[in-house]
Amino acid sequence: MGFAPVTPAAVETYDPDVDHDDESNGLDGFRVRSKRSGKFSGGYSDSPREVGDGYGVRSRARSNMKMYGGFKSEFDSDHDSGSGFGLKRKYNGNPKVSADFDADSDDEIVLVPKATRLRTHGKPSSGDFSHGSGGGFPLKSFGDRNFASHGFKPKNFSKPEPNFSQDLDYDDEFDDDRAEREGFNPRIQSSRSSSRVNGYSRKDGSYPRNTGASNGYGSSSRFKHEQMNAAAEVESDPIDEVVSSVKMLTEMFVRVENSKMEMMREMEKSRMEMELKHCQMMLESQQQIIGAFAEALSEKKSTNARRPVS
């Protein structure tokens, strides 16, 4: 399918008093629409930006221009059909107009294929273009690119706990938030109102689901609670506490005395050994003294016997 050539005579002359923002007047065989960025009109040549013969461009705030075209055998004012191509003007890759802009250069106009979002202007039709309600779509999407409906907020119904443990049984836990919503709000009255098991706490008054216990504690902490109760019952009698303390003191005293006696026994033994050694040394010295005197006397007697009598 080819497009018919557009001549200046076939294009309606531009009227500055008429609003061309929505769409141009019906043309037999060709239809031109402009959105926000610029206007196409025939015979308008006041602006220095010229495209073709007898075809002018009136630019607005943005530098993008779009063309919507299609062939129709008959004109319908209620519906339009737009398809084909998109024309996007770039100024050397910069969306802003520079001082050295050359409108006649081929590098300034770039054809950009668009296939982002369909925007129909009527009911889609599978027939030819002669139908007035043919489906058309712009080749550039406008507005928000988020295809979700406005006001839609996805709701997160579950939030994993950061301290989740696979070894912990969560079946016996009680949903406090649901209890508060249903009107049940247990209050904590004492320091033993909560039991901590592996870093997870349970409020007093919560009833385990899968167990028959009614003491307010889960199955994971029941054994510890029984031990605490047994210890509290044993320590409840003050006389027993006094007796146990006295017994402990006497045992400590006996141990201290035994250690003292052991120390004294060791010291006495060492002292007796030292005295025994001292006595032995004295006996040896006395024996040596007596031996010396005996030798001296014996020598004196022998000398007297050798002298002759005169």
Swiss-Prot record:
Biased composition annotated in UniProt, kind: Acidic residues: 14-25
Keyword line: Phosphoprotein
Keyword presence, Kinase: no
Transmembrane regions listed in the UniProt entry: none
Recorded GO CC terms: plant-type vacuole
Modified residues (Phosphoserine): 77, 105
Disruption phenotype: No visible phenotype under normal growth conditions.
Biased amino acid composition, Polar residues: 208-221
PANTHER family: TRIHELIX TRANSCRIPTION FACTOR ASIL2, TRIHELIX TRANSCRIPTION FACTOR ASIL2-LIKE
Protein's name according to its UniProt entry: Protein FIP2
InterPro entries registered for this protein in UniProt: ASIL1/2-like (IPR044823)
Region spans: Disordered: 1-58, 115-135, 152-171, 177-221
Quaternary structure (record): Interacts with FRI. Interacts with WAV3.
Organism of origin: Arabidopsis thaliana
